[in-house]
């Protein structure tokens, strides 16, 4: 990411969920705290909560959200028995004089993962309800969707005005990203467990609208040297 940021100032680093809870030692050992610290070091701009993240429990998850130096989103998760959202539904970022909305959607398995402490509302209905509000505030709309590829293919026809969907939950790799010609929506997904990184470049026209895109999926092999700062951070957990 440091190399990418050297060549472009207009970069968003996003995560599509199931990142804080997992079977890997670092996540289990620290209940996701080290993951958040690493994401802070990398300069993440936003992530969406995945269903597995709720296995940490709400109290621990709230602590991780406080530690994060970036917004952790979910527009469709509410505390059981209330209409109170558990997380921020969306955030507006200003990138190169363009206002970019980033919305988070969590799959409905989150409710069982949290032991019934939360309810995951219908994500499509939630998105439709949000789009008018968000479209008035932003030039570009990105959805961080922890719903899986099949659901992501349906989103552009269910809610107009989405420019980019960054997908998680399913293990699909879309290489290159798909383009929904009818809606103009780009759909990107890069697999799971940090094995790959998806890169999408959006071209903006003079009206502040998306006029084109390019995308690729990069496999993170040993040819990429360790970042010294990140290596030093990880070494403290050995």
Map each language-model feature to its residues.
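Acidic, metal/ion-coordinating pockets
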Residues: 1-238
């Amino acid at each position: 990411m440091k190399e990418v940021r050297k060549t472009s100032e207009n970069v968003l680093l996003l995560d599509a969920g199931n990142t804080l809870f997992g079977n890997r030692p670092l996540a289990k050992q620290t209940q996701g705290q080290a993951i958040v610290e690493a994401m802070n070091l990398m300069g993440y701009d936003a992530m969406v909560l995945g269903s597995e993240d709720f296995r940490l429990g709400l109290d621990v998850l709230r602590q991780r959200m406080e530690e994060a130096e970036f917004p952790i989103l979910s527009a469709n998760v509410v505390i059981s028995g209330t209409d109170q959202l558990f997380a921020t539904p969306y955030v507006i970022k200003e990138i190169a004089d363009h206002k970019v909305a980033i919305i988070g959607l969590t799959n409905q398995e989150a409710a069982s993962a949290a032991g019934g402490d939360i309810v995951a509302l219908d994500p499509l209905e939630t998105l439709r309800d949000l789009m008018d509000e968000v479209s008035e505030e932003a030039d570009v709309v990105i959805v961080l969707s922890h719903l899986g590829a099949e659901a992501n293919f349906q989103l552009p026809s269910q809610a107009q005005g989405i420019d980019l969907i960054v997908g998680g939950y399913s293990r699909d790799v879309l290489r290159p990203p798909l383009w929904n010609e009818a809606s103009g929506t780009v759909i990107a997904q890069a697999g799971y467990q940090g094995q790959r990184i998806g890169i999408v470049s959006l071209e903006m026209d003079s009206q502040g609208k998306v006029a084109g895109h390019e995308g690729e999926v990069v496999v993170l092999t040993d040819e990429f040297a360790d970042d010294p700062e990140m290596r030093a951070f990880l070494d403290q957990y050995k």
